[in-house]
């Protein structure tokens, strides 16, 4: 399989998985219809998924390093399909069980990042990994965007979640077929002991152990730890993505499933277009740290405007449009820089798994905090995300020199030229 076809397959597998995992959008409220504190429960489902991801992503990444990327890809796509079967009974227990199983398969994204790193050079990896990081991190936007098309063309899809669930099952089945077509990018047949897999998973739950592994990696590749902290702060700042459904359906906006579908179609389309243009044509020509500083300040303003858009759908749409073409680029940008650094350090699958696990921890924290804050005020989660954006700005300003080497270089190929110039 040619490199271009392989990369296209990687993107398709990730997009299909993201849609299959997050496609219900506003219809998720049907699963908690008769329960109190619906905004809290809607966001709590995401928190449960990310907590399980924390344990299993490093284990899946390690498995892909030992046995290859293809077996891990096939196994996670099959499990992802099975998890969506739990959504057929429209019950709260089915939704929570689905989130638990989905958390067990989110290691797929670290495997796909590893497969991409296996076959691309630094500047290619910067561009492609940026797009992949955006797609994987924007599931709560892109999933409802794609599934929203069904709601717009078929009225039954706005009344019951079942037609959408069937669509997600079809997408999941197609993804299994794509996984079997995926050619190995890191052929290995090294033995994997069950004890070692369990050890990786249990160590991941000990966040201190993961943090210590990151500190060790920083000794071999100086700069990766502060860059990862920047990525975590950006993840905290983007936590409002998982809050959108609760905000649109449970706040004074009271948007219908049809209106929510139009919103996700607008936001998702603009964000995908902005990220495609940026990572295809711009990323290798700009100072990435200055770009992050600019985006974080725009993010602070956007969060303030979101907090006061509850009374006006028009204002909400305008703010979201500006947000989509600017701030949505941030997590892809920090994630792509990390991917280049990990490629230099080796042990890609396990390291990507650790990064996804700790990134999942950041997402879990923001989902949990937003769940609790939404019980106080629907504005409060945006205030928290705004404060996180300020933290991104401050940390990027104080980024140490060994990390700035990566963020300030326009082309990643410049990094190889430095020793020769010295």
Tell me the role of every PLM-derived stretch.
Residues 1-4, 184-228, 414-422:
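Juxtamembrane intracellular "pre-TM" segments in multi-pass secondary transporters
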Residues 57-68, 274-288, 374:
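Helix-to-loop junctions at the C-terminal end of transmembrane segments
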Residues 98-136:
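Cytoplasmic helix-loop-helix junction between adjacent transmembrane helices
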């Amino acid at each position: 399989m040619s490199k271009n076809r392989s990369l296209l397959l990687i993107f398709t597998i990730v997009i299909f998985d993201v849609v299959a995992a997050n496609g219900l959008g506003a219809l998720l409220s049907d699963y908690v219809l008769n329960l109190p504190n619906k905004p809290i429960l809607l966001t709590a489902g995401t928190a449960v998924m990310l907590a399980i991801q924390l344990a299993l992503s490093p284990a899946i990444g390690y498995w892909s390093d030992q046995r290859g990327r293809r077996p891990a890809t096939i196994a996670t796509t099959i499990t992802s399909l099975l998890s969506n079967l739990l959504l057929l009974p429209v019950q709260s227990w089915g939704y929570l069980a689905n989130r638990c199983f989905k958390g067990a398969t989110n290691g797929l994204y670290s495997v796909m990042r590893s497969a991409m790193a296996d076959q691309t050079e630094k500047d290619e990896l910067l561009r492609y990994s940026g797009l992949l990081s955006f797609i994987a991190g924007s599931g709560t936007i892109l999933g409802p965007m794609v599934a929203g098309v069904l709601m717009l063309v078929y009225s039954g899809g706005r009344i019951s979640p079942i037609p959408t669930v069937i669509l997600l099952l079809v997408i999941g089945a197609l993804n299994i077929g794509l996984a079997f077509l995926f050619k190995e990018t890191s052929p290995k047949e090294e033995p994997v002991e069950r004890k070692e897999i369990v050890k990786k998973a249990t160590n991941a739950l000990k966040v201190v152990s993961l943090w210590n592994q990151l500190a060790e990696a920083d000794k071999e590749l100086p700069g990766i730890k502060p860059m990862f902290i920047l990525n975590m702060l950006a993840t905290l700042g983007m936590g409002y993505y998982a809050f959108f459904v609760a905000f649109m359906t449970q706040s004074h906006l009271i948007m219908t499933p049809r209106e929510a579908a139009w919103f996700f179609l607008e936001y998702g389309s603009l964000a995908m277009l902005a990220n495609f243009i940026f990572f295809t044509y711009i990323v290798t020509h700009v100072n990435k740290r200055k770009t992050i500083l600019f985006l974080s300040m725009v993010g602070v303003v956007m969060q303030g405007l979101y907090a006061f858009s509850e009374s006006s759908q028009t204002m909400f749409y305008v703010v979201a449009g500006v947000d989509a073409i600017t701030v949505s680029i941030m997590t892809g940008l920090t994630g792509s820089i990390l991917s280049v650094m990990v490629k230099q350090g080796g042990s890609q699958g396990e390291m990507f798994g650790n990064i996804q696990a700790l990134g999942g921890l950041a997402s879990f924290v923001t989902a949990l905090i937003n769940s609790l804050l939404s019980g106080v005020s629907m504005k409060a989660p945006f205030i928290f995300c705004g404060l996180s954006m300020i933290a991104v700005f401050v940390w990027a300003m104080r980024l140490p020199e060994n990390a700035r080497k990566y963020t300030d270089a326009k082309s990643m190929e410049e990094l190889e030229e430095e020793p020769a110039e010295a």
